[in-house]
């Protein structure tokens, strides 16, 4: 955002110097202000805190809407183990910051290049560019979170590293533009969200 602000400032300076009409300058200035405000809104990264009295609770990692709740066989890390998949679709207007869903230790981090088809499609989970993170808590519960790029998203940022500790209330990463997050959690987990339900990152209890 700093470089965008600098670029817009330089552009307006050039227009101010080179254009005799102040009308054109003010139009350009208004467009620049609108552009910067849009990017400032889109890349917002709010600080949120949640208090939980159960270290096994899994918190929503993202703002969005639940589009998948189904049992699956997970092969990337869990070698075909049956797990419950919960997917959250993030629209272009959603906050695109991602939070840690479970306090514990990061056991696995991988980034995969791929396609950029619409993130709400089921096959996007495997075919699109994505990053996978596995977290294990103090009680041995393991979950996987997968950040998935969408049709517009072209960059996934993951802040955590393997063999480091992580805690809820901390940011896990960021996905730029419309995208999706998949959670793979133990089959025996009690699910507290329904299909179509809106989630708030680092606030909504998933399981």
Which residue ranges define each predicted feature?
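Contiguous, well-folded functional domains in the mature portion of proteins
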Residues: 1-207
């Amino acid at each position: 955002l700093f470089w965008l602000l600098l670029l817009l400032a330089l552009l307006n300076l050039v227009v101010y110097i080179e254009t005799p009409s102040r009308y054109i300058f003010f139009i350009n200035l208004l467009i620049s202000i609108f552009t910067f405000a849009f990017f400032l809104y889109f890349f917002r990264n709010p600080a949120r805190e949640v208090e939980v009295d159960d270290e096994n609770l899994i918190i929503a990692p993202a703002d969005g809407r639940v589009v998948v709740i189904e049992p699956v066989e997970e092969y990337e890390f869990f070698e075909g183990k049956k797990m419950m998949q919960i997917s959250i679709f993030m629209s272009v207007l959603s906050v695109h910051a991602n939070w840690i869903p479970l306090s514990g230790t990061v056991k696995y981090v991988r980034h995969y290049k791929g396609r950029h088809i619409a993130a709400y499609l089921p096959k996007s989970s495997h075919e699109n560019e994505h990053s996978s993170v596995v977290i294990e808590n103090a009680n041995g519960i393991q979950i996987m979170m997968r950040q998935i790029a969408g049709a517009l998203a072209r960059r996934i940022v993951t802040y955590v590293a393997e063999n480091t500790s992580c805690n809820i209330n901390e940011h896990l990463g960021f996905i730029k533009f419309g995208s999706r997050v998949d959670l793979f959690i133990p089959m025996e987990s009690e699910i507290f969200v329904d299909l179509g339900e809106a989630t708030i990152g680092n606030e909504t209890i998933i399981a």
